[in-house]
Amino acid sequence: FKVLKRGDKLNLETAQDENDLTDSGLRYDLTLPLSRYYANNASSLPSPFKALQMGSVWRADRPQKGRFRQFTQCDIDILGDATNLAEIELILATTTALGKICPDNGFTVRINDRGILFGMARYCGFSEEAMDSVLITLDKMDKIGFEGVEKELLENGNAKESVDRYLELLRTVTRDAEGVKALGETLKDVMDPAVCQGLVHIMETVKDVAETEFGLVFDPTLVRGMSYYTGTIFEVSMEGFGGFCCRRRTLR
């Protein structure tokens, strides 16, 4: 998959490599352009800065069910707010909009935090070097299930004791705010308690003030965006569609 130079005449004779002919691409998402805009204009923008935008984006993926080379993306972003209010507002805005678009189709918000993902892995004895590999495998849970995750973790050279402890923890934690509280107590020696406290605050506040009916569950297997996101993660799914809406915090 290649894209050509934008508006430039190609010099096929002097090109040493095919990559010499390909330095421009179609817009992959709306987040990076927004980041550039914010970086260049932060001094003149309100803080926090809230943005809503819609536009076409492109992928190099092979077209298949649920994957398109071009589609319309809707982004809502909050920049410059380090508090949980940003997550709460984004979840409420998303669910309110979805409730008006598809009022008869129930949907579920799955939520997690990257700090919890790393805390669970450390608690179970995985090395720091193995963290990324472990979470990449965990992210496949929807597709390959517990047995597939166990098999891949062992094939990657992780200790069976750590794998068994990890899967048992994933199976037993409850998928609600009480489960997050219990997990925070379990992981208190390997993780900042504020991580679980913050997630509980988000979940309880959203349930208290939401005007739309939807499911809200803690999902300890929700990973996504390995190198991109650093904090809270949430994803919206609907029966027949799978995950079709997501948002994550980036503290960079």
Model-derived regions, located:
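Glycine-rich phosphate/pyrophosphate-binding loops
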Residues: 107
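Short acidic alpha-helix initiation/capping motifs at coil-to-helix transition points
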Residues: 110-112, 140-144, 160, 194
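Extended alpha-helical scaffolds
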Residues: 101-104, 114-117, 130
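Active-site nucleophile/metal-coordination loop of metallo-enzymes that catalyze phosphate/sulfate
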Residues: 2-25, 29
